[in-house]
Amino acid sequence: LSNAISVQDIGLTGQTHADGLAVGRPSGFVGGVMKPFLSGEMTVRDGRLYEYMRDLLQTEDIFLEPSACAAVQGPVMLSEREELREYIRNHGLEEKMGNASHILWATGGSLVPPEVREEYKNTYLE
């Protein structure tokens, strides 16, 4: 769809705690460039950003700012959503998933001041 759709078209406001990632309408140019490489897009609730941040901190001892944790949503959805499991089946990927590695482009976190980290760690949204 590239720039033919906006977040408002699907009932979202565009207001987010992940302000560095907020894009109300995708770029037509970038959409065209990415089309051969992209199988889908997703949205993530702000509350999940903080949940993923706490999970990564607890299990991996890695602190990422909440917006960087949006990258976690894709692999999570692969296991939770039937339409994505169907995509995997339809593309003959079921046998490969056991050896799959999900690489997350997760920048951010090392320069977040300690008091802001604590605020993030104690942020709970719906």
Question: In which residue ranges do the predicted regions lie?
Answer:
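Glycine-rich phosphate/pyrophosphate-binding loop at beta-loop-alpha junctions
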Residues: 1-36, 86-126
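Active-site-adjacent helical/loop segments in soluble small-molecule enzymes
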Residues: 25-94
